[in-house]
């Protein structure tokens, strides 16, 4: 079995990575950078975002400040790799989103959206099926269930259970709206930067990274990908409990 290790280059994590390499070699795994069978993500949720987009099953080792979706403690690494070798694990599949703009396609694990970072609002048009709405504020995010535990939660204070087959449309700091989000079945949406009477430019973000800019009257499509992120589970993941603990509730 060939594994790739993904982590941030910090002194604390470098020690953990070396530990994983030694255990992997002892158990007969080959640690490589290309042509791998599995990805070992070492860190927190940010590292997991990078790992799932490599297209292989992920082993999620919790070694960061915030890792709500990481299930393997550092002191259980050898146990997890032994079980990987035996095939003793549960495979969980997670929804992925795609952002389409012109010829550009970007894959998102948590959320995709349009945001503004100037001290004024933008108006975003949202279209799906026969629905057409406009929301004025700092922007709009479209979130997966797992994404609702991240950026989306800071805007809505709500959580979608990870097994729910749905997406959440999140209104970021909306003006004059008490409604903060809408949960809908997995559908293709169009997000459009609407005209407020003068030109504006907004950021298109995928998992917290700016991937392109759009101008007034331009739009992006957000759709559910045919691909799934696969995370191998060795220990019970108590997402609700982790969220309550992380936010000291």
Curated annotation (Swiss-Prot):
PANTHER family to which the protein is assigned, alphabetical: BIFUNCTIONAL NADP PHOSPHATASE_NAD KINASE (PTHR20275:SF43), NAD KINASE (PTHR20275)
Main location: cytoplasm
Organism: Saccharolobus solfataricus (strain ATCC 35092 / DSM 1617 / JCM 11322 / P2)
Requisite cofactors: a divalent metal cation
InterPro entries: ATP-NAD_kinase_N (IPR017438), ATP-NAD_kinase_PpnK-typ_C (IPR017437), NAD/diacylglycerol_kinase_sf (IPR016064), NADK (IPR002504)
Keyword set, alphabetical order: ATP-binding, Cytoplasm, Kinase, NAD, NADP, Nucleotide-binding, Transferase
Record-given protein name: NAD kinase
Any one GO biological process: NAD metabolic process
